[in-house]
Amino acid sequence: MAKHKRKGLEGTGKESKRQKITPAEETPRTSEAGPDKETASTLVQEASPELSPEERRVLERKLKKERKKEEKKRLREAGIAATQTAKVQTLPAKPSAATLALEYLQGWAQKQESWRFQKTRQTWLLLHMYDEDKVPDEHFPTLLDYLEGLRGSARELTVRKAEALMQKLDEAEPEDSGGSPGKVQRLRQVLQLLS
């Protein structure tokens, strides 16, 4: 029976501990932050004889919210844009599709264990392999090696597109439609490799 009484006393002890916390004890914490907080804690202390502990906590929360609003307002006026630009600078920029595809190709060439097939990267490489700006000359031999292993419909489609592009360039050659010699050379290399 005595144990039950002690449990009952502990339960009330917890409640009384909550009630014992007064704003006066919290004053050192609040006074460290600034003058606005000091005035808020004095307001709570002045009202403490009249207010219950619950009402004091509610009042403290309201005052804390008001302080936060004022602080945000001051920051906005001071130029919060500076902090926003700092956040933007800390975020890493996403790599472009070109860099991702070229890294994919280099990973394949080095036979890295982390390399795995990615259809989107392969598609990008197949679409842009004739463009010297997007796939530099230094990466093109590696791309040709990659194309040797190309299988299935991707291989057939690449051959068809290369043949169609070659016919288009041959027909437009007398007019010189802008087919660069590098592009034509790349087309021939791809056709020789895959045909």
From Swiss-Prot:
The gene is Chlsn. Keywords: Phosphoprotein, Secreted. It comes from Mus musculus (Mouse). This is Cholesin. Residues 8-18, 26-39, 53-77 have a biased composition (Basic and acidic residues). The keyword ATP-binding does not apply. Induction: Expression is induced by feeding and cholesterol absorption. Residues 1-78 are annotated as: Disordered. GO terms for biological process: negative regulation of cholesterol biosynthetic process. Pfam families: WKF. Its main location: secreted. Hormone secreted from the intestine in response to cholesterol, where it acts to inhibit cholesterol synthesis in the liver and VLDL secretion,leading to a reduction in circulating cholesterol levels. Acts through binding to its receptor, GPR146. The modification Phosphoserine is found at residues 41, 48, 52, 96. One of its GO terms (molecular function) is hormone activity. The keyword ATP-binding does not apply. It is found in: Secreted. Disruption phenotype: Intestine-specific knockout mice have elevated plasma cholesterol levels with increased cholesterol synthesis and VLDL secretion. GO terms for cellular component: extracellular space. It comes from the Eukaryota. PANTHER family: CHROMOSOME 7 OPEN READING FRAME 50. Secreted via exosomes, secreted from the instestine, secretion is induced by feeding and cholesterol absorption. Expressed in enterocytes.
